[in-house]
Amino acid sequence: NTFKECYAQIMSDFDEALKYLPEQYTDVNEDQVPAKYAQKGATNAEYNRAFGINHRGKIDGRIISAFKAQLAILAASPAYASAGVASYEDAAKYAANCLSEFGGLDAVDPDGWKWFCNKSLIDGLGATSENPKEIIWRGNVEESNSLETDCYPPSLYGSGKINPTQNLVDAFPMANGYPITDANAEYDAKNPYQNRDPRLAAYILVNGDKIGATDGVVNSAADSKTLDGLNKENGKSTKTGYYLRKLLRPDVNLNPSSTTKQKHLPARIRTTEILLDYAEAANEAQGPKANVGGANYSAYDVIKAIRKRAGLGESGEDPYLEECA
């Protein structure tokens, strides 16, 4: 089958699913049973048995809308645009439609960029809990330490499997919003991690950082006296000078004498992802400040909100973003 045929079939399947799936699994009262089921004599007890909160975590209408946005931005991309099945305007429309279920631009959750280590939030989630604002689709919240076992540095009994690269670290701007290569960045090569985008410290473990239940200091330098150092032990020590922090619970202890597990929130689709899909599509379609696809916000509005959430800018302004827009 061609890409065009596959795209058409997948979108058709999504549309068919939307005819039957609720936007969100929730219990209803007798007078809230959707008309198409009430007309067939369904009671609220029967409706709730099929579409109630006990089914949360399964595919619902909001997840399908997110799938459509993901597929459309893929189809509009340079890799598949020649198939002619979706434009960037189409992709923006699908993303905006999905986001409308979450308040549009209000889908930007102030704490959403740190969802994976929000202990009080995660510990309060049950199987039938409503998703946090940041999350469209998630897996079950369960106690584990497998991510930490894979990714903690070896001094903390981890395998150090994921090593962020230098170009990823360099992509994080300064706290004032400017790229580190910009003359206005005030970047200090001798203190490369000072005054950086707060997301750098939240997502990547750099030399001298602390992590783990015992707050162990990680020395990932080439002259490190520990196994955390650059290329100290094949298969465990970092090959780049960095270790992953994102997705990990910093309160997990892997010490064999006092091993602990913690609950994890596996986010499969986040509202931030769909917001960025919209921003990309809207910008490509009509530029940074156009409202596209029925949305009342632009690519610029999305990027500004996400950067502001992370704490970028100075004195409440984001001069670098204004230069770009």
What kind of feature is each model-predicted range?
Residues 7, 14-15, 52-232:
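An aromatic- and glycine-enriched ligand-binding surface/loop that stacks and positions planar moieties
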Residues 1-5, 10, 24:
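A conserved hydrophobic secondary-structure block that centers on an alpha-helix together
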Residues 26-52, 227-236, 319-322:
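Charged, glycine/proline-rich intrinsically disordered loops and linkers
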Residues 193, 198-308:
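C-terminal substrate/ligand-recognition segments
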Residues 25-37, 81-84, 108-112, 291-298, ...:
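Short, glycine/acidic-rich hinge or "gate" loops at secondary-structure transitions
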Residues 1, 76, 316-325:
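Short, intrinsically disordered, charge-balanced linker/junction segments flanking boundaries
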